[in-house]
Amino acid sequence: MCFNNIETGDEVETERQVFGSSEEDEFRVEDTARNTNNVQISQQQQQPLAHVVKWERYLPVRSLKVLLVENDDSTRHIVTALLKNCSYEVTAVPDVLEAWRILEDEKSCIDLVLTEVDMPVHSGTGLLSKIMSHKTLKNIPVIMMSSHDSMVLVFKCLSNGAVDFLVKPIRKNELKNLWQHVWRRCHSSSGSGSESGIHDKKSVKPESTQGSENDASISDEHRNESGSSGGLSNQDGGSDNGSGTQSSWTKRASDTKSTSPSNQFPDAPNKKGTYENGCAHVNRLKEAEDQKEQIGTGSQTGMSMSKKAEEPGDLEKNAKYSVQALERNNDDTLNRSSGNSQVESKAPSSNREDLQSLEQTLKKTREDRDYKVGDRSVLRHSNLSAFSKYNNGATSAKKAPEENVESCSPHDSPIAKLLGSSSSSDNPLKQQSSGSDRWAQREAALMKFRLKRKERCFEKKVRYHSRKKLAEQRPHVKGQFIRKRDDHKSGSEDN
């Protein structure tokens, strides 16, 4: 029994120890939580006040004082009531003189001026100019109002310094937004420097443009001085005259390329196988050489440049390029003439006589056609053909170059002396042989097409005549066909 009591006593003691330890732990947890809360509160109190947002900086604390200048009593009372409803402090004045007295009073503290433009004694624009010319009052925003909204008046008020222009009748929502002008003016004058930055930018831009213009003028003057100075300034040893001749040479070459239009056909070859364009090019080469010689006699440095330009290798290169250009022009003429003949084949002939004359002329051209050196592959038709009215301009253009054939002989040009006359005679023969084959094929196709068209038109014409005869045989009244009636039968029926 004693042993059992001892055991039960030990169990009770152990239970007490366990419960006591759990209670101590709970107290410790509560103490730690309180300590952490106290630390957080102390940290929040120790935070600097700079992070706190002050709305007083952005929102107006007090109501704005508005000075209303209006000579009409009813309008003045209405606008005053509207301003008071918008939580403004209003000082209404019927005259400009009284308004100026209030503005000069330091105790008034006017934040905004709302004035009428047209007034009997002193106008609102006079008050505006007077406020803008004052040292301290020019910071007060002035708003003009009027029943006239002409562009001239609005521009005059805004150019004199007005912040806004309101047109009567004035609405309440317009008056609610008047505080924004005061806020902008205070914000700009508080040190943000937005307006001053704009003015600085505007003033800097014209200075930069003037500087660029001055630099451009200085560079132009420097170029002119260098152009007027002697040839010793050039590093290559060439004179200004020599460079001028070289530039004139390149300019003339570009001018000759630009003056020949790509849409026009080149000149037709003459009987001697020379081209007018080639002669003109040769004449230009001669003129350029003469100018080089004249300039070369003037100065020693010019002589060096002219000698370089008159080297035989350069002349041979130029001659080769000119001959190649002439060959290309000849190829273009052949291709274009083939295109023109195809276009001409589509032109319809209206009468049988024209068709017959065309056939006769085509047969004659087959038999009597002579292919000469340098001739253009163009269909030769008589004046009675349908193509005569299209070829008048071409024939007149051909006659003009043939008058000056002798002046453009190949023996006069230095290019012909260097290259010989073989280059100008061999190429047209090859081109003409290929053009003759094309011409024969084209002529056969034209004949076939015209015969088919003739048969088709004849069938249509026969059909038309037969139907016309049948229609004439049928009598009709007012466009409607009727049956024939015998006069004898109708007379017997009447009796």
Curated annotation (Swiss-Prot):
Key words of the record: Biological rhythms, Coiled coil, Nucleus, Phosphoprotein, Transcription, Transcription regulation, Two-component regulatory system
Source organism: Arabidopsis thaliana (Mouse-ear cress)
A single cellular component GO annotation: nucleus
Subunit structure: Interacts with APRR1/TOC1 (via N-terminus).
Family statement: Belongs to the ARR-like family.
Single biological process term from Gene Ontology: cytokinin-activated signaling pathway
Location(s) in or outside the cell: Nucleus
Outcome reported for the amino acid change (mutating Q210E): In strain: cv. Cvi-0 and cv. Landsberg erecta
Coiled-coil zones: 349-372
Role summary: Controls photoperiodic flowering response. Component of the circadian clock. Controls the degradation of APRR1/TOC1 by the SCF(ZTL) complex. Expression of several members of the ARR-like family is controlled by circadian rhythm. The particular coordinated sequential expression of APRR9, APRR7, APRR5, APRR3 and APPR1 result to circadian waves that may be at the basis of the endogenous circadian clock.
Region feature (Disordered): 188-441, 465-495
Domain Response regulatory as annotated: residue spans: 65-183
Chief localisation class: nucleus
Gene3D superfamilies named in the record: 3.40.50.2300
Record protein name field: Two-component response regulator-like APRR3
Biased composition (Polar residues): 206-217, 256-265, 294-304, 335-350, 380-395, 420-436
PANTHER family: TWO-COMPONENT RESPONSE REGULATOR, TWO-COMPONENT RESPONSE REGULATOR-LIKE APRR3
PROSITE patterns hit by this protein: CCT, RESPONSE_REGULATORY
Domain CCT: 442-484
Composition bias type Low complexity, residue spans: 231-248
Impact when changing N329K: In strain: cv. Cvi-0 and cv. Landsberg erecta
Keyword Disulfide bond applies: no
Bias (Basic and acidic residues) ranges: 284-293, 307-319, 351-378, 483-495
